């Protein structure tokens, strides 16, 4: 919803998403082009009950659609997040691993693909976070993709297109870390 889960109203978010899944599947599920689900809550830090949303909504989507693939695209709580720029502390690689290990343990069987957004950390840190993402995905039998942000967070004006050299750095870090696929926005 972009609203309820951010306000901590997790059951309302779950109910709304389940109704939407039912409606979308009824209307579009018969199309050959319908190949999976995107669970749209883009989170970073462990939030109380957030993994419950991923788990319940993901399992429901899979149950109504004959086990179609589910994808999440969270973000790394790094130095370029709005929260950190407003005074919150960025997660270290170790903290990121600990928090996401717990989240992914809670969503086993509900999420098939994890595609972390890559724009909230410094370029020199990206590879280390991607390695952890891949390690965790492997642990929980998920596919690990990268979601490459094709805009530049380092500019005072948000969001200008990224320079090719920076995009290439991100692609190379993803390749070296073993990402299985790349998407972008």
Model region roles, listed by residue range:
Residues 1-185:
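Glycan-processing catalytic domains of CAZymes
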């Amino acid at each position: 919803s972009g609203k309820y889960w951010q306000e901590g109203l997790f059951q309302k978010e779950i109910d709304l998403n389940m109704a939407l899944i039912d409606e979308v599947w009824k209307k579009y599920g018969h199309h050959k082009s319908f190949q999976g689900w995107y669970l749209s809550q883009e989170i970073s830090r462990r939030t109380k009950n957030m993994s419950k949303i991923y788990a319940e909504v993901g399992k429901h989507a899979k149950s109504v659609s004959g086990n179609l693939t589910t994808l999440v695209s969270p973000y790394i709580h790094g130095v370029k997040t709005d929260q950190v720029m407003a005074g919150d502390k960025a997660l270290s690689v170790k903290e990121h691993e600990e928090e996401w290990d717990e989240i992914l343990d809670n969503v086993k069987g509900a999420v098939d693909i994890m595609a972390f957004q890559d724009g909230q950390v410094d370029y020199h840190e990206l590879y280390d976070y991607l390695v952890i993402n891949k390690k965790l995905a492997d642990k929980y039998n998920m596919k690990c993709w990268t979601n490459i942000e094709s805009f530049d967070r380092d500019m005072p004006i948000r969001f200008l297109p990224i320079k090719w050299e920076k995009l290439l750095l991100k692609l190379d870090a993803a390749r070296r870390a073993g990402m299985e696929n790349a998407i972008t926005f």
